């Protein structure tokens, strides 16, 4: 889920709704007792553990940060410090599109999902799933 991955990519503490780890669609009341239906959907525990590991990356705590909205409801965000950067691409409506990134061409592990990300000719192919990868920072 792109919004959840984007929340984990932000600086500061990540806040989840009660039941979000079980794909609950019911929004709980903030002021009344409202039990979570723990059988409401698929378990997202592994995804949240992977995002939690990503959240502990030093660049998320110590780096500078920039986010921008692209066409097609895609958010692109970058944390950087020194010669390294962490780039995130989040398609909040599942849009598929090529996205220009300031990263050297190559293959990188997707820290927000499974598999690898390929940067080719300065672009990544957004398939609608969240992308987060670490690369050398390009000189400007």
Predicted regions and their residues:
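Generic hydrophobic alpha-helical scaffold/packing signal
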Residues: 1-8, 49-52, 75
């Amino acid at each position: 889920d792109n919004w959840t991955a984007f929340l984990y990519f932000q600086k500061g503490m990540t806040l989840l709704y009660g039941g979000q780890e079980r794909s609950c669609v019911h929004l709980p009341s903030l002021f009344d007792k409202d039990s979570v239906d723990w059988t409401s959907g698929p378990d997202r525990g592994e995804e949240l553990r992977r995002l939690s590991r990503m959240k502990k990356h030093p660049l998320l705590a110590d780096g500078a940060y920039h986010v921008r909205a692209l066409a097609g409801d895609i958010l692109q965000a970058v944390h950087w410090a020194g010669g390294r950067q962490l780039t995130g691409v989040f398609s909040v409506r599942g849009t598929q599109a090529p996205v220009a990134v300031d990263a050297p061409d190559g293959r990188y592990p997707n820290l927000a999902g499974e598999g690898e990300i390929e940067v080719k000719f300065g672009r990544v192919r957004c398939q609608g799933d969240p992308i987060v990868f670490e690369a050398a920072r390009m000189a400007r």
